[in-house]
Amino acid sequence: MEPIKNLPRLCRTLGYEFKNLDLLTQALTHRSAANKHNERLEFLGDSILSIVISDALYHQFPKATEGDLSRMRATLVRGDTLTLIAQAFKLGDYLFLGPGELKSGGFRRESILADAVEAIIGAIYLDSDLEVCRQLLLNWYAERLAEIQPGINQKDAKTLLQEYLQGLKKPLPDYQVINIEGDAHDQTFTVECRIDDLSQSVIGVASSRRKAEQIAAAQVLELLKK
């Protein structure tokens, strides 16, 4: 199992100092690495994230319908959003993975990264309380909550990027698969996204080409809005 690097540095990145670092260690431990892994914490964190985001949307949009609220919540808590949060925190550098997952690039796999975010939320809840979790999550989600709006459909990142570039009369993005790893039933795709306004390409990694393209597009959007 690969040793965790710098937990205090991760705490600073998360914006939370753990009283019990064992909880954070467990949250970063994949089931391939140890018996005491992060799946129970993930279960807890998933529920906490859902209630915090539901509450925030309910108060932010007093006239929104139940359907609109549900769609906005789904956009904010879905796997690719959590993967982007994990990548911003560089969680892949801190994960405990078994030899097989390490070899297959599990530290980049979107499902493992997304699950680790939920597990960390569960760990923070156990280390503190619901109100601390709420304030921290609202901080993590501040930009996304400020940008989201009710609508019939919550558009995906590729669509939003395409519409953004079309609005500026810019060329559309170019997506290229630059690497495929793993067995046929468990592959990891690395996709490169290039646009004229960015000097460097942006990389997305996921279990399918489509998901990798979405992750790359979402990262490009975040860079363009800075």
Swiss-Prot record:
Where is this chain's protein located in or outside the cell? Answer: Cytoplasm
What's a Pfam family in this record? Ribonucleas_3_3
What SUPFAM superfamilies does this protein's entry cite? dsRNA-binding domain-like, RNase III domain-like
Name the Enzyme Commission number(s) assigned to this protein. 3.1.26.3
Q: Which PROSITE patterns match?
A: DS_RBD, RNASE_3_1, RNASE_3_2
Occurrences of domain RNase III (ranges): 7-129
Q: Which UniProt keywords apply?
A: Cytoplasm, Endonuclease, Hydrolase, Magnesium, Metal-binding, mRNA processing, Nuclease, RNA-binding, rRNA processing, rRNA-binding, tRNA processing
HAMAP family registered for this protein in UniProt: RNase_III
Q: Which NCBIfam families match?
A: RNaseIII (TIGR02191)
Q: What is this protein called?
A: Ribonuclease 3
